[in-house]
Amino acid sequence: ERNVVGGDKELCTDFVCFFEACFPKIPSVMVSSDESEAIKYFSNVFLAYKVAYFNKIYDFCHATGMDYNNVRKGVTGDSRIGKSHTQVPGIDNDRGFGGTCFPKDLNSLITQFEERNINCDMLKEVWLYNEEIRTVIDWPVT
């Protein structure tokens, strides 16, 4: 949906021109390398939050006897929310999020927030909830 090009402005300009020539309908964003890394982390962690949030909705529906798919359809019918990352269980037939990106990026942000003394309780809660509901640990454990 967008190309993010991070690094030295002179070098990035060539890449942006290339991407815009090859993919004229896809906008490009030229930023510093630190900003491009932040964009990746924040984008992935937002989607991890979304997965966790819809798993919470699933828990609520299960506890109250509501049909999750009916509720999900109504909520995701709002174009601001969208349907991606709302299937419970997910495409891997497990709850929560796994894989190589979401767990790594969420934990990296937790560390970066802690190093800067920025409250990250919300990030930690998402991680703890994911560990609680996820049956398959398919990410590297350090």
Name these PLM-found stretches.
Residues 1-84, 112-119, 129:
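Internal alpha-helical scaffold of NAD(P)-dependent oxidoreductase catalytic cores
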Residues 3, 137-142:
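Acidic, glycine/proline-rich low-complexity segments that act as flexible tails and inter-domain linkers
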Residues 68-124, 135-139:
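C-terminal substrate-binding/catalytic lobe of Rossmann-fold NAD(P)-dependent oxidoreductases
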Residues 128-134:
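A short beta-alpha structural unit
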